[in-house]
Regions:
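Short N-terminal "domain-start" leader segments
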Residues: 1-26, 31-32, 56-81, 85-89, ...
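A short, charged, amphipathic alpha-helix used as a generic interaction element across diverse proteins
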Residues: 25-30, 34-56
Length: 101
């Protein structure tokens, strides 16, 4: 494997024999902190989402599971799990200002 890109604690390797990329979080063990991605563009997007705690809307289930696998933040993992379960957001009701407590 050849190291292609690194930013903070995220590293992207290229596996030439399988024509794919491996994204690895150095804060985790190898077994639970890496994922395989087919394109360099997807690998870069995965790193960007992890570092900025973004949850993309139009991605497949494998991408969301990869985000969950690479993340170290418990809150971020819970948000991704809600998206995987089908719940998009937490329930929120904006009370009017004139509402009596």
């Amino acid at each position: 494997m050849k190291k292609v890109f690194a930013r903070k604690y995220m590293v992207v390797f290229e596996r030439e024999e399988h024509d794919e990329f491996v994204v690895y979080n150095t804060k985790k063990e190898w077994e639970e902190g890496h994922t395989h991605i087919h394109t360099y563009k997807q690998a870069m997007y995965l790193v960007d989402c992890i570092l900025n705690n973004k949850i993309p809307k139009k991605v497949n289930k494998y991408f969301l599971v990869s985000l969950q696998r690479l993340s170290t933040s418990k809150k971020y993992k819970e948000q991704i799990q809600r998206r995987l379960d089908g719940d998009t957001k937490e329930e929120y009701y904006n009370r009017p200002k004139y509402y009596r407590k």
